[in-house]
């Protein structure tokens, strides 16, 4: 392989690695994993210095700069995909049912989720409001279960900043 092509490919790969670690570290920091974020930042900086020095030592070739920039963009996507797979943290899922159904909370509880429910008033009558706290990795599965039970449900999820007390199950049933 030509030395110029080797440098371009190396810059591209090293920058993907750097930005992937950077993205995951940033997400770890936001989720409160301080020590893991700090440890990953050590590797992030080592890789960053290597990538930047490769580009700065070879600024005469525009392909090196482009490889750095494209590697940066690809690294963000890869980092986000990794974080989606890891799915750290919890989500609060709020559900407004299409119709008032007293059995719905128990159906969801039977799947292993903790549910708080109450009567709500909608434009077209009584609804049931549910609040469910679950691990992010269970979000899609929970949505699927809710839609199977009540296809017309309105579902919104958000990430809580802090959690204290409440009902927890050891494992959500498959």
UniProtKB/Swiss-Prot annotation:
Pfam family, one: DUF2179
Keyword presence, tRNA processing: no
Domain of life (superkingdom): Bacteria
Keywords: Cell membrane, Membrane, Transmembrane, Transmembrane helix
GO cellular component, as recorded: plasma membrane
Main location group: membrane
UniProt topology in membrane: Multi-pass membrane protein
Compartments it resides in: Cell membrane
Transmembrane portions of the chain: 4-24, 36-56, 62-82
PANTHER family (alphabetical): UPF0316 PROTEIN YEBE
Family per record: Belongs to the UPF0316 family.
Full protein name: UPF0316 protein lmo1776
């Amino acid at each position: 392989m030509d030395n110029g092509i080797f440098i371009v490919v190396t810059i591209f790969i090293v920058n993907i690695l750097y930005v992937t670690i950077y993205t995951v570290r940033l997400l770890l920091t936001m989720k409160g994993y301080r020590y893991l974020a700090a440890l990953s930042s050590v590797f992030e900086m080592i890789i960053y210095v290597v990538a930047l020095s490769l580009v700065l030592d070879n600024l005469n070739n525009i392909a090196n700069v482009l490889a750095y920039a494209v590697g940066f963009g690809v690294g963000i996507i890869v980092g986000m995909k990794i974080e989606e797979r890891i799915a750290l943290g919890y989500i609060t899922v709020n559900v407004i049912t299409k119709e008032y159904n007293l059995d719905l909370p128990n159906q969801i509880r039977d799947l292993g989720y903790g549910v708080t429910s109450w009567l709500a008033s909608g434009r077209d009558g009584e609804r049931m409001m549910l609040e469910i706290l679950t691990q992010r990795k269970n979000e899609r599965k929970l949505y699927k279960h809710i839609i199977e039970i009540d296809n017309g449900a309105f579902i919104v999820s958000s990430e809580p900043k802090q959690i204290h007390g409440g009902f927890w199950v050891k494992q959500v049933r498959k």
